[in-house]
Amino acid sequence: MKLVLLLPWACCCLCGSALATGFLYPFPAAALQQHGYPEQGAGSPGNGYSSRRHWCHHTVTRTVSCQVQNGSETVVQRVYQSCRWPGPCANLVSYRTLIRPTYRVSYRTVTALEWRCCPGFTGSNCEEECMNCTRLSDMSERLTTLEAKVLLLEAAEQPSGPDNDLPPPQSTPPTWNEDFLPDAIPIAHPGPRRRRPTGPAGPPGQMGPPGPAGPPGSKGEQGQTGEKGPVGPPGLLGPPGPRGLPGEMGRPGPPGPPGPAGSPGLLPNTPQGVLYSLQTPTDKENGDSQLNPAVVDTVLTGIPGPRGPPGPPGPPGPHGPPGPPGAPGSQGLVDERVVARPSGEPSVKEEEDKASAAEGEGVQQLREALKILAERVLILEHMIGVHDPLASPEGGSGQDAALRANLKMKRGGPRPDGILAALLGPDPAQKSADQAGDRK
């Protein structure tokens, strides 16, 4: 009875233990990785502790692409619907509008940590150590040891006086090919060898091609100054140089002695110079200034000078008498301006007369001012002696003193101002009067 009860319980236990191995429990992959170090396949350090300590974290900045939503678009989608009932029927086609977002490619900067070799180590597993002070000292010790061994080997191979140049007989044949490598030294069991004596020097070889030009050497020091040589013979006379610039004007010399008295000359019949003076406006009724000539009698010595240039043209002559009346002309056209003008308004002729009268007043004032200015200029010219070359004797000759002693100022009658009238032109009042007479 107990056996019957225990048998089903034992079967359940055995079946449960057998089926338990078939279940799979998912574990996260991060739980299986070693925390603190990356995987081996992704360039991470190995499992050994010596390789792990050569890996370090490095901050890396990367630019990665990503999709960013950029608006939306409307799409028309076709939808097919099958028959919902049994039997022959046509498929139904419908359309619907969808609004879906659009994306564009953008770039952003990502900062991440990567496992890389620590400073001073290289290689795929960061096992190779870069050159540093420790390795340099180790290499120096190894080099010193090798140099000491080379010195010991050179001291051990002292040449002994051989009886002949042949090598000693060997009990065992060498393991290398003597003909192929005559000067090779075996690594194991080298055996004693004797150095052969040095042979005679061979003939000199042919001269090789010239080598490339070397770089220029540094500039040498400046040599000592040589002794001064003898003076050479004088050279040939050179060509004359160009003419120099004119020098500055010298100071005027002292006045010379007075010359001898000349023979008395003939008195001239005509006056030698005329000086003009202005009268007061009270002498005339209209207030115009009047020129009064002052005749100066001079007594000069010497021959007369050359003939002067011709003078300016004279003033225009007086207005001639009016001619005989002409034949009556044909009847002229009617002036539209006169016909169309209403009564009481001034005609064009009257307006022109008024404008010319106003203009004549300004011109008359200007003529008066120019007349006075011309009189003053003429007086100054006669005082200086511009129009009379004999009236300005050379200074220092003694004639200027005689001229000043013999000058006599005389006032005469009025002289017509024909020259001034020629310079100033016709009077605008007279001109307007002449024009009115011509029109009549």
Curated annotation (Swiss-Prot):
PROSITE patterns per UniProt: EMI
Q: Its principal location?
A: secreted
Q: Where in the cell is it found?
A: Secreted, Extracellular space, Extracellular matrix
Q: Which residues form the EMI domain?
A: 52-128
What InterPro entries does the record tag this protein with? Collagen, Collagen/C1q_domain, EMI_domain
Q: Where is this region: Disordered?
A: 157-362, 390-440
So which residues are the signal peptide here?
A: 1-20
Instruction: Name all Collagen-like domain ranges.
Output: 199-267, 302-334
Q: In which tissues is it expressed?
A: Specifically expressed in the testis and ovary in adult tissues.
Task: For this UniProt record, give its keywords in alphabetical order, as a comma-separated list.
Answer: Collagen, Disulfide bond, Extracellular matrix, Glycoprotein, Hydroxylation, Repeat, Secreted, Signal
Residues annotated as glycosylated are: N70, N132
Q: Name one GO biological process term.
A: positive regulation of cell-substrate adhesion
Q: Which GO terms describe its cellular component?
A: collagen trimer; endoplasmic reticulum; extracellular matrix; extracellular region; Golgi apparatus
Q: List the disulfide bonds.
A: C56-C118, C83-C89, C117-C126
UniProt's post-translational modification comment states: Hydroxylated on proline residues. N-glycosylated.
One Pfam family name is Collagen
Superkingdom of origin organism: Eukaryota
Q: In what ranges is there compositional bias, type Polar residues?
A: 269-281
Looking up Gene3D superfamilies in the UniProt record yields: 6-Phosphogluconate Dehydrogenase, domain 3
Which stretches are tagged as biased composition: Pro residues? 200-215, 231-243, 252-261, 306-327
Keyword field contains Iron-sulfur? no
Q: Which residue stretches does the UniProt record annotate as biased composition, category Basic and acidic residues? A: 347-356
The subunit field of the Swiss-Prot or TrEMBL record says: Homotrimer or heterotrimer.
Q: What is the name of the protein in this document? A: Collagen alpha-1(XXVI) chain
Gene this protein is translated from: Col26a1
